[in-house]
UniProtKB/Swiss-Prot annotation:
Belongs to the Casparian strip membrane proteins (CASP) family. This is CASP-like protein 5A3. It is found in: Cell membrane. Residues 1-31 are annotated as: Disordered. InterPro entries: CASP_dom, CASPL-5. Homodimer and heterodimers. Residues 72-81, 148-164 are extracellular. It comes from Zea mays.
Amino acid sequence: MRASRPAVHPVEAAPPPPAAAAEGPEAQVEGAAHPRGVRMKDPPGAPGTPAGLGLRLAQAFFAAAALAVMASTNDFPSVSAFSYLVAAAILQCLWSLLLAFVDIYALLVKRSLRNARAVCIFTIGDGITGTITLGAACASAGITVLIGNDLNICAENHCASFETATALAFISWFALAPSCILNFWSMASR
């Protein structure tokens, strides 16, 4: 029989054993071990938790801010590293917003995102977007240092905007790193 498996599973608490309730509070303390097969709660920052949603929204916000600051300059297309930063910020913003919507759905229906396939997709996506965002931020930082410190041509360029966009891209990556690590840990601990 083929049956579909949803990406979100209900979180159900196991009822207390009837024998412990009948014996009194002393028996409850002694038999306080969790029954076999009960999982611990999702760690803060995992998909489907309020902290996970906060991390996703922070990722999207800082990526969108980096995109807006870089796009506000008229000469960013002349440097390939800055164009790469814009493309990476767009990808990061879209990925983070997509997963934020998944987190919102899971929170609204009070479900946990513990499906192995979903966690694997989240981990791979976070790893790819994180690598791209970090690479773009590092490349932009290198060009910004070259323009500002080595060539001393900040007078005719938007160095402050370039530095701000680069810093925002790094902050977006720092918000992505805990999500990626928690997803990888969750996937590896299965």
